[in-house]
């Protein structure tokens, strides 16, 4: 709290009738019909949003106000991960306002968030779309169905840290619906389906509005921005003329999906049908997950051994942010029989790179196609961006010290040789045991730990072996130093992309560290 407990009540400029919620002066957002303030739930100790809507003379009688209150208060029963939590509401008869307490999203609405983060991949937009549609399926499945009627990017809110998207302003939509007179329509013309103007509509008006939301997210253009007033928008909408922004959608799949959303009501798909559309279906959560974790690697149990050329496209990566630096990613592979297998693994944005993780995954899962590495790496980059738009992937090529450090640690290399054919680069993984060279000295060897007297012949052999092994180590170290110098100089002569491709084909572990 910004002041001591004795003065805490002075921070609030208004308190709800129960004394539980206190409103601050800070305004989080403003709309045509409401203002949203920062508020505090004293019982739970959490910040909330205090939505205050000014009522007009359409609610002149107490019966009208009570009817409105009952309709809005029913929203408290709505509980879904894609719907903003609605805590309580009440009517202030003295000031003619209705107040709604909801959860607060400090990242703002989706329109503000999209303007702030220009570089959002299509995959992130698909994830947001799925969440919105899942919320609409929930609303539309009620009996009678709950229709939002004023869905737009301004009424969809996002938690930037988690990538959560939730539909909001349902209470305001209900108020506006109740406020309609016989011959007037209150809403946002750019997002209103043609049938809304005729006041003969169903849940599909929300699908139309969702399509316009997606159009705005893709193009950064408000629908029908070519029009100068609401009358022009009305004429275009009722005449079936699509917004000019649709022409700026260059991806044919995206455009086709948006057109399905804003089609004539007789041809428009429901939210449930859209979730099954091929455009979004590949991102649907699989209920038969086969997952495992390894502290220092990735377990391939349950994963297909190899992807054919036709199956590369049936590979996806999904993620969920767990803390400030860690995102748990899920690699999903579909085999030739159509069976889906998943593997979950942590990705630390501070220490991991998509390229090194992709290389290790391909090796662990025995995926031999070089294309799989770049495909997985790009998917990981895209997924991380969907959770952290400001994240910058680590790129290749750096100072000589990093190269020297990596080359001087042969344990990081997977192959037994470099292109030169020298096999001394090969080094066993930790715990490899008997995979080591039979001539390498071992700390637990009988040679070094044998007890008791030793005969003269054995002693001579031991002495000569120690001398030979010492000389061998010195020669190997000298060759390593020569190779370090040769490889370092060699890599300097080529662009980063060429070096990266070469390291991919060599299947070198930690290749990002080699070059960054």
Swiss-Prot record:
Keywords: ATP-binding, Coiled coil, Kinase, Nucleotide-binding, Serine/threonine-protein kinase, Transferase
Gene3D superfamilies according to UniProt: Phosphatidylinositol 3-kinase Catalytic Subunit, Chain A, domain 1 (3.10.20.90), Phosphorylase Kinase, domain 1 (3.30.200.20), Transferase(Phosphotransferase) domain 1 (1.10.510.10)
SUPFAM superfamilies tied to this protein: Protein kinase-like (PK-like) (SSF56112)
Ranges of residues in domain Protein kinase: 22-280
Renumbered residue ranges of the record's region Disordered: 426-451
UniProt key word ATP-binding: yes
Active-site residues annotated for this sequence: 169
InterPro entries in the record: Kinase-like_dom_sf (IPR011009), Kinase_OSR1/WNK_CCT (IPR024678), Prot_kinase_dom (IPR000719), Ser/Thr_kinase_AS (IPR008271), WNK_Ser-Thr_kinase (IPR050588)
Record's function text: May regulate flowering time by modulating the photoperiod pathway.
Name used for this protein in its record: Probable serine/threonine-protein kinase WNK3
Encoding gene (name): WNK3
């Amino acid at each position: 709290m910004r002041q001591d407990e004795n003065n805490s009540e002075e921070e609030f400029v208004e308190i709800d009738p129960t004394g539980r919620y206190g409103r601050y002066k800070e305004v989080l957002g403003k709309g045509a019909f409401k203002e949203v303030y920062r508020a505090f739930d004293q019982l739970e100790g959490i910040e909330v949003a205090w939505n205050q809507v000014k009522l007009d003379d359409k609610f002149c009688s107490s019966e009208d106000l009570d009817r409105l209150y009952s309709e809005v208060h029913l929203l408290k029963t709505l509980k879904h991960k894609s719907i903003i939590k609605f805590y309580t509401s009440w009517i202030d008869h003295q000031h003619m306002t209705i107040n709604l307490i909801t959860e607060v999203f400090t990242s703002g609405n989706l329109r503000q968030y999209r303007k702030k983060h220009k570089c959002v991949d299509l995959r992130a937009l698909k994830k947001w779309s799925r969440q919105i549609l899942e919320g609409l399926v929930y609303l539309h499945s009620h009996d009678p169905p709950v229709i939002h009627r004023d869905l737009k990017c301004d009424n969809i809110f996002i938690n930037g840290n988690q990538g959560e998207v939730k539909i909001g302003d349902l209470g305001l939509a209900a108020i506006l619906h109740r406020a309609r007179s016989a011959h007037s329509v209150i809403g946002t013309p750019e997002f209103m389906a043609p049938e809304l103007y005729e006041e003969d509509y169903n849940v599909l008006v929300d699908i139309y509005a969702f399509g316009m939301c997606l159009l705005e997210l893709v193009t950064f253009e408000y629908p029908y921005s070519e029009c100068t007033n609401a009358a022009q928008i009305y004429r275009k909408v009722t005449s079936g003329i699509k917004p000019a922004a649709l022409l700026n959608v260059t991806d044919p799949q995206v455009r086709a999906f948006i057109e399905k959303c804003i089609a004539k009501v007789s041809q428009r798909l429901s939210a449930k049908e859209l979730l099954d559309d091929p455009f979004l279906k590949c991102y649907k959560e699989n209920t038969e997950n086969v997952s495992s974790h390894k502290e220092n690697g990735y377990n391939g149990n349950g994963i297909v051994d190899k992807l054919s050329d036709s199956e590369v496209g049936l590979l996806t990566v999904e993620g969920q942010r767990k803390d400030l630096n860690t995102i748990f990613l899920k690699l999903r592979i579909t085999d030739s029989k159509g069976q889906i297998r998943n593997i979950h693994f942590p990705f630390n944005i501070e220490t991991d790179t998509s390229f090194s993780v992709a290389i290790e995954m391909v090796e662990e899962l025995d995926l031999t196609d070089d294309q799989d590495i770049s495909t997985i790496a790009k998917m990981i980059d895209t997924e991380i961006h969907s959770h952290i738009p400001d994240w910058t992937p680590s790129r290749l090529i750096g100072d000589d010290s990093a190269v020297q450090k990596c080359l001087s640690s042969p344990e990081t290399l997977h192959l037994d040789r470099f292109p030169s054919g020298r096999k001394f680069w090969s080094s066993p993984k930790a715990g490899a045991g008997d995979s080591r060279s039979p001539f390498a000295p071992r700390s637990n060897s009988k040679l070094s730990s044998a007890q008791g007297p030793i005969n003269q012949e054995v002693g001579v052999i031991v002495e000569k072996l120690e001398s030979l092994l010492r000389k061998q180590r010195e020669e190997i170290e000298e060759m390593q130093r020569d190779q370090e110098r040769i490889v370092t100089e060699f890599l300097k002569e080529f662009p980063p992309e060429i070096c990266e491709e070469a390291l991919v084909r060599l299947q070198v572990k930690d290749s990002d560290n080699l070059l960054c």
